[in-house]
Regions:
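Ribokinase/PfkB-type carbohydrate-kinase core domain
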Residues: 1-29, 41-202
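Peri-catalytic substrate-binding/gating loops that frame the active-site cleft of hydrolases
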Residues: 33-40
Length: 202
């Protein structure tokens, strides 16, 4: 089995589904006359890296030299996301494409989530030869690759990325999504959560 270097000494590349987590904070003081829902007066907006971006900033917080790669739209949300990622010390190596950046918007009041709205599509159509070659070039610069899959299409051709890592002898860690773990064949380590593991083993 491939030895995984200590993260404290390794350059780690996170490839996966990058998204923006947006929080609207405010006070819910009354019920709307239009429908039985609270009216929230928004007082603060908080933008954070989500998905693979969250994984990358958590690694950077542990002192790991981290690069983030994936796909985003060529839009204002991508600009905000890049700023939030780089502020945490993560190198931004994310490709823009014609899709819209994924945004997950949560409306919060008194530390309670009232609703979540997802603005997203699939990036599958944009995982082309240029993105795969770009990813292979990044793989050559790093000691460990972490694939962060949220089933949004960025890792639609995950087998190609795993093969590229194996050819270079680079360890591949996978944070999987769904029950088809066969697509991650060749990875050094797969780290499902309990529900994902139970779905696979029955």
């Amino acid at each position: 089995m491939t030895n995984v270097p200590s993260f404290s000494n390794a350059k780690v590349l996170v490839i996966g589904d990058v998204m923006l987590d947006r929080f609207w904070h405010g006070q819910a003081t009354r019920i709307s006359p239009e429908a039985p829902v609270p009216i929230v007066k928004v007082s603060d907006v908080d933008d954070r890296p989500g998905g693979a971006g969250n994984v990358a900033v958590n690694l950077a917080a542990l002192g790991v030299a981290t690069t983030l790669s994936g796909l985003v739209g060529d839009d204002a949300h991508a600009v905000l996301l890049r700023a939030a990622v780089e502020e945490k010390g993560v190198r931004w190596s994310v490709m823009p494409c014609a899709a819209e950046t994924i945004v997950k918007l949560r409306v919060m009041s008194r530390n309670q989530q009232l609703i979540r709205m997802d603005f997203e599509g699939s990036f599958s159509d944009y995982v082309d030869s240029s993105f795969l070659q770009y990813s292979r070039n990044l793989i050559a610069e790093h000691d460990v690759i972490l694939l962060s899959d949220y089933a949004k299409g960025t890792l639609n051709q995950v087998g190609s990325l795993i093969d590229a890592c194996k050819r270079r002898g680079v360890p591949i860690l996978v944070d999987p999504k769904g029950s088809d773990f066969e697509r991650y064949r060749g990875a050094s380590i797969i780290t499902p959560n309990l529900s994902e593991f139970e779905a696979v083993v029955g």
